């Protein structure tokens, strides 16, 4: 914990993550004190149930041909089974699988578990959390084509947002024709780094060596090309900077490997991001 607070506390990504993780922080740290609260001090608040229910959001947005097996919502079924890359999660009420929020969300969920593992274990929520983060991780790996350990192609989005937003229905009822695929062999550095971060923290938490291998490869891909994703993004998740994502991923890769190269990347990209430098056109 101190590593990130000291090394990344000034970065905009960590500030955003701190806000996102606040519900986990509040819920888990308050749990030990709940039994001691007086009746006049909101004794009806149940932070354990809040944590449990908050994760149902991901079950509700699960996508692919394993929803019925992996998800905990009995009213959800398999969907979009003809996607070029199955799995993953829908974004925000629509059914697009956007890359930028997916990587950010998965890494933040992993961070919550990394910080408060004992609370998840005590509340019996570790298995559910792992199902969600593993589902993210498998999708990220399936989006990535490797050749001798090097990324040669990377899918960063499934679905055309404008087309998707013109159709309002349950995901199971949406036309299951193969949806538009957005991929690159030399870009989307912001999203590749986000996936790398999520895979690295999932390796730290649960020890799947394949997650770490893909995390390293995606990170090398990200810093090799240094271009943000543009095609298909529109104004939904438009990004002008990849340094914050690269710093965030470097921190987790350092914790996963103890390789000082990643610590150097962390400092370099964190400083670049804080100084407002951008690797692509725009402000």
Protein language model regions, located:
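Short, Lys/Arg-enriched N-terminal segments with co-localized hydrophobic residues
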Residues: 1-4
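Sec-dependent N-terminal signal peptides
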Residues: 10-28
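Sec-dependent signal peptide cleavage junction
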Residues: 25-43
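Low-complexity, Ser/Thr/Pro/Gly-enriched N-terminal "stalk/linker" regions
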Residues: 38-100, 104, 134-183
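Short, surface-exposed loop/turn segments at secondary-structure junctions
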Residues: 45, 92, 118-130, 209, ...
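Long, well-ordered core segments of solenoidal/helical folds
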Residues: 54-66, 78-80, 132-148, 214-230, ...
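Well-ordered alpha-helical scaffold segments within catalytic/enzyme domains
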Residues: 56-64, 106-123, 138-146, 194-208, ...
């Amino acid at each position: 914990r101190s590593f990130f607070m000291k090394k990344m506390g000034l970065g905009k990504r960590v500030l955003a993550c701190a806000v996102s993780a606040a519900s986990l922080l509040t819920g888990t740290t308050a749990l030990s004190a709940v039994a001691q609260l007086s009746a006049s001090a909101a004794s009806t608040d149940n932070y354990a149930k809040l944590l449990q229910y908050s994760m149902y959001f991901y079950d509700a947005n699960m996508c692919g041909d394993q929803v019925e097996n992996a998800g905990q919502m009995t009213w959800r079924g398999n969907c979009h089974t003809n996607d070029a890359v199955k799995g993953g999660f829908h974004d925000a009420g629509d059914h697009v699988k956007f890359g930028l929020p997916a990587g950010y969300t998965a890494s933040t969920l992993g961070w919550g578990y990394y910080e408060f593992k004992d609370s998840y274990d005590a509340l019996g929520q570790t298995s559910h959390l792992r199902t969600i983060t593993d589902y993210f991780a498998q999708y990220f790996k399936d989006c990535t084509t490797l050749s001798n350990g090097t990324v040669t192609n990377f899918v960063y989005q499934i679905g055309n947002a404008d087309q998707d937003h013109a159709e309002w229905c349950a995901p199971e009822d949406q036309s299951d024709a193969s949806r538009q695929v957005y991929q690159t062999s030399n870009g989307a550095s912001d999203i590749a780094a986000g996936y790398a971060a999520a895979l690295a923290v999932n390796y730290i938490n649960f020890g799947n060596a394949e997650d770490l291998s893909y995390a390293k490869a995606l990170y090398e891909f990200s810093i090799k090309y240094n271009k943000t994703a543009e095609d298909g993004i529109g104004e939904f998740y438009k990004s002008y900077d990849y340094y914050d994502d690269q710093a965030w991923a470097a921190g987790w890769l350092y914790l996963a490997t103890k390789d000082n190269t990643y610590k150097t990347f962390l400092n370099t990209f964190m400083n670049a991001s804080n100084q407002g430098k951008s690797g692509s056109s725009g402000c």
